[in-house]
Design a protein with these regions (language model features):
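Generic detector of leucine side chains in alpha-helical contexts
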Residues: 8-9, 16-18, 29, 33, ...
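Active-site and donor-binding regions of nucleotide-sugar-utilizing enzymes
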Residues: 23-27, 46-144
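Active-site-proximal region of nucleotide-activated glycan assembly enzymes
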Residues: 109-201
Length: 202
């Protein structure tokens, strides 16, 4: 059974990153995809926090218009840069919902979503077309158990052990504080930005 991550790496060449989790995760992801996987990767920022961790460059752009204009902006961006995959963190944010709707109408586009891991500590979830309620994963326990058993037998080994990540609240708090401070500090540069918890599709 091929993982979503393997499918993404095999089938995507020109990738657009939207909003990631608070902090530098998407910047590290962009570097990895370019340096280790040979992908062409672009990034769109929506606020000053995004821009702080992913400064404007030849591959990083700021979207400063209203959400009503985002789909048209996205279309022009995709065509100009020949994007074949869009990646984001969480599919409930308004720009991500609009991007998914756009991808569903574009036969050659795919839409990929990171989310905090569902079941196992130290893991992050990565799915095609949606997460949580919008996930396309089967919800039947028997099929999960069968798939896990088949994978274990096929590979003749136990699942790989997890590399634990240190819980570091102070580091995460500093990253988040800086992110939200930059949103406030650069609010005049992004006058139409609204935090995803404050916005809904009409």
């Amino acid at each position: 059974m091929k993982s979503f991550w393997a499918e993404f790496l095999e089938g995507s060449n020109r990738v657009l990153l939207l909003q990631g989790p608070v902090g530098p995760f998407f910047t590290h992801l962009q570097d990895y995809l370019v340096d280790k996987q040979g992908k062409t990767v672009f990034k769109i920022n929506f606020n000053g926090g995004d821009e702080y961790y992913a400064p404007i460059s030849r591959a990083t752009f700021n979207f400063v218009d209203s959400k009503k204009e985002f789909t048209v902006y996205l279309h022009h961006f995709v065509v100009k840069h020949q994007i074949d995959a869009i990646v984001c963190f969480g599919d409930g944010r308004i720009y991500h919902k609009l991007a998914k709707e756009y991808c569903l109408q574009s036969p050659k586009m795919t839409f990929w979503v990171f989310e905090e891991g569902y079941l196992r500590p130290h893991y992050i979830t990565f799915e095609k077309w949606g997460v949580n309620y919008n996930s396309t994963l089967c919800r039947e326990q028997d099929r999960f158990e069968t798939a896990l058993y088949c994978d274990t037998v096929r590979e003749n080994r136990e699942p790989k052990p997890v590399l634990p990540l240190a819980a570091n609240f102070s580091t995460r708090a500093k990253i988040a504080a800086r992110y939200y401070y930059e949103i406030w500090r650069k609010r005049s540069d992004f006058p139409n930005y609204r935090h995803h918890r404050e916005t809904r599709l009409p």
